[in-house]
Amino acid sequence: IHRVLWLRTLEIAFFVTVFCFLMAYPIAHLLATLPMKYSNLLMICVLLPFWTSLLVRTASWMILLQQQGVVNDFFVGIGLVADDNRPEMMYNKTGSYVAMTQILLPFMVLPLYSVMKTISPSLMRAGKSLGGTPFVAFWKVYFPLTIPGIGAGCLLVFILAIGYYITPALVGGASGTLISNQIAFHMKSTLDWSFASAMGLMLLSGVLVIYWLYNKIVGIDNIKLG
């Protein structure tokens, strides 16, 4: 059972990191390229979740994702699902994915933005003037320059996600909980502190291994946090 829990923890942390990257990249690009007054407004929206308690944000997702919640009402309203066939998005992996992605999104946006802000717009224009299409110029010129920010954001989000506790405990249910929830269970319910400590040490060791692998493959000196 613990092997399944470890695999689920890695799976959820991986997909949350992927979802955060897919959402954060265009947001960070807008922050870096929009005029100052609009980018400042967008930055406020990105940082706004930090001004709210994590518990409050998680509780808000519990209200939004329930079967009679706002998200399902919206899906029914646009005809995506039938009213009598509303999907269950609470107490499963879906709830963990959605809530954790929203909560951890700023930790991906900020490293990407700090790198994109230093990239000169003239580089893209030069790529286009040399005969490249906008996509080729982006892929060959712009994207490689953002890799340090991608590495920093992915490493930060993955490490935070792999040890997350409150959000999976409230919205994940039995199929969306992580190893940290099991550690807390043994600490508070079974009082098996030695086993909980061993699991915590394994979690810490796993994080250090991930950090070591990243350093070997990419190089920790290439990380850009701003």
Q: Model features per residue range: what roles?
A:
Residues 169-216:
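Interhelical loop and adjacent transmembrane-helix boundary motif
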Residues 34-42, 71, 122, 134, ...:
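Membrane-helix interface segments
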Residues 15-47, 62-63, 117, 122-124, ...:
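Transmembrane-helix boundary motif in ABC transporter permease subunits
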Residues 58-101, 135, 171-175:
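Membrane-interfacial helix termini and adjacent extracytoplasmic/periplasmic loops
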Residues 1-17, 34, 86, 189-190:
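Periplasmic/extracellular loop-to-transmembrane helix junction in inner-membrane transport proteins
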Residues 113-124, 128, 197-226:
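C-terminal transmembrane helix and the adjacent membrane-cytosol boundary/short C-terminal tail
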Residues 51-58:
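Transmembrane alpha-helices and adjacent helix-loop boundaries
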Residues 102, 107-121, 128, 132-163:
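Transmembrane alpha-helices
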